[in-house]
């Protein structure tokens, strides 16, 4: 959520910035009308509350003197209904203004390139050289079918489309990848391993901005009067650990990682990547989350992105780093780097990690704060999140980049300790 002061005092300027940077149209006239009504009703509410308090005090004083208080009581009763109605109206207006605020995306950093979509993203660097094959390259679906590793048909019987059953050595490789990533981030990168719930409440999703805007992409459960959501990413529970908390300055940056299942309805995917495991309703990811001081978040963002890069480098997977343009960034982000891994079957780079600095946008929603030792007062923290990395897509990249002519897969050296020393799987 943006600073409410921007909405109150600079709505026209804010609307122009949102229009040019995000393609978002803010209804300034509606906002100004609501704000004018809020101010008017708030003034009247405060007048009535002050009057109630003064008359209540007068009643107490009169009773202490043994005087008749019926006239004062009648006066209080006369404006009590107006006060109640005024308080209800004020709450309703605040809710309407908050609903508008919750639907406004974050403002991009000044150094984020302007653009409409992924075609305007700016490549920052590349690592590794794509392998030249002397045989016909198979994609992960063909490799999986050839070896009996990936079973979409059985998964469809069990759950429908966009699910996959992994069997045998490929299931082991998938598990090895997740273990390798968690060990790397905890052992070398200083993140604390955290095991989080896969079901969260609506407040958690509002805190990290999935609600209310992206509800259609969430899986929702209801048991009796209890409603919970399956997490779309462990960013949600990890970041919400500091919701309504004041973190001591010496604990920052707070770095957490979690390997978890993730669940997405893919409502806006438009039928893309229906073949194979690129885009699934259920997938696994190793997530990185940092809570930092505002002045440190830029450096923390660079560090987090580098931690994700190291995963790909240790696996020997060629990739490129891309700075997302204003039109391709996520709703909550101030700035985002994507890492895209090389897939030989597509002869292109595909996203495998997205690392974002959200500034104080999520923290304001969550009231996640830190105590500034310079002032002794609580201030909004900055939140960052990134994939470190998507496990299924890493498995796809390993399968395709390390495939052999006979359909076997060479196990990357970094994974062999997790595979019982196996050098190939077939």
UniProtKB/Swiss-Prot annotation:
<dbReference type="InterPro" id="IPR033729">
    <property type="entry name" value="SerRS_core"/>
</dbReference>
<dbReference type="Pfam" id="PF00587">
    <property type="entry name" value="tRNA-synt_2b"/>
</dbReference>
<dbReference type="InterPro" id="IPR015866">
    <property type="entry name" value="Ser-tRNA-synth_1_N"/>
</dbReference>
<dbReference type="InterPro" id="IPR002317">
    <property type="entry name" value="Ser-tRNA-ligase_type_1"/>
</dbReference>
<keyword id="KW-0547">Nucleotide-binding</keyword>
<keyword id="KW-0030">Aminoacyl-tRNA synthetase</keyword>
<comment type="function">
    <text>Catalyzes the attachment of serine to tRNA(Ser). Is also able to aminoacylate tRNA(Sec) with serine, to form the misacylated tRNA L-seryl-tRNA(Sec), which will be further converted into selenocysteinyl-tRNA(Sec).</text>
</comment>
<dbReference type="GO" id="GO:0004828">
    <property type="term" value="F:serine-tRNA ligase activity"/>
</dbReference>
<feature type="binding site">
    <location>
        <position position="287"/>
    </location>
    <ligand>
        <name>L-serine</name>
    </ligand>
</feature>
<keyword id="KW-0963">Cytoplasm</keyword>
<feature type="binding site">
    <location>
        <begin position="351"/>
        <end position="354"/>
    </location>
    <ligand>
        <name>ATP</name>
    </ligand>
</feature>
<feature type="binding site">
    <location>
        <begin position="233"/>
        <end position="235"/>
    </location>
    <ligand>
        <name>L-serine</name>
    </ligand>
</feature>
<feature type="binding site">
    <location>
        <begin position="264"/>
        <end position="266"/>
    </location>
    <ligand>
        <name>ATP</name>
    </ligand>
</feature>
<dbReference type="GO" id="GO:0006434">
    <property type="term" value="P:seryl-tRNA aminoacylation"/>
</dbReference>
<comment type="subunit">
    <text>Homodimer. The tRNA molecule binds across the dimer.</text>
</comment>
<protein>
    <recommendedName>
        <fullName>Serine--tRNA ligase</fullName>
        <ecNumber>6.1.1.11</ecNumber>
    </recommendedName>
</protein>
<dbReference type="GO" id="GO:0005737">
    <property type="term" value="C:cytoplasm"/>
</dbReference>
<feature type="binding site">
    <location>
        <position position="387"/>
    </location>
    <ligand>
        <name>L-serine</name>
    </ligand>
</feature>
<dbReference type="InterPro" id="IPR042103">
    <property type="entry name" value="SerRS_1_N_sf"/>
</dbReference>
<dbReference type="InterPro" id="IPR010978">
    <property type="entry name" value="tRNA-bd_arm"/>
</dbReference>
<comment type="similarity">
    <text>Belongs to the class-II aminoacyl-tRNA synthetase family. Type-1 seryl-tRNA synthetase subfamily.</text>
</comment>
<dbReference type="InterPro" id="IPR045864">
    <property type="entry name" value="aa-tRNA-synth_II/BPL/LPL"/>
</dbReference>
<dbReference type="GO" id="GO:0016260">
    <property type="term" value="P:selenocysteine biosynthetic process"/>
</dbReference>
<dbReference type="InterPro" id="IPR002314">
    <property type="entry name" value="aa-tRNA-synt_IIb"/>
</dbReference>
<comment type="pathway">
    <text>Aminoacyl-tRNA biosynthesis; selenocysteinyl-tRNA(Sec) biosynthesis; L-seryl-tRNA(Sec) from L-serine and tRNA(Sec): step 1/1.</text>
</comment>
<dbReference type="Pfam" id="PF02403">
    <property type="entry name" value="Seryl_tRNA_N"/>
</dbReference>
<keyword id="KW-0067">ATP-binding</keyword>
<dbReference type="GO" id="GO:0005524">
    <property type="term" value="F:ATP binding"/>
</dbReference>
<keyword id="KW-0648">Protein biosynthesis</keyword>
<dbReference type="InterPro" id="IPR006195">
    <property type="entry name" value="aa-tRNA-synth_II"/>
</dbReference>
<keyword id="KW-0436">Ligase</keyword>
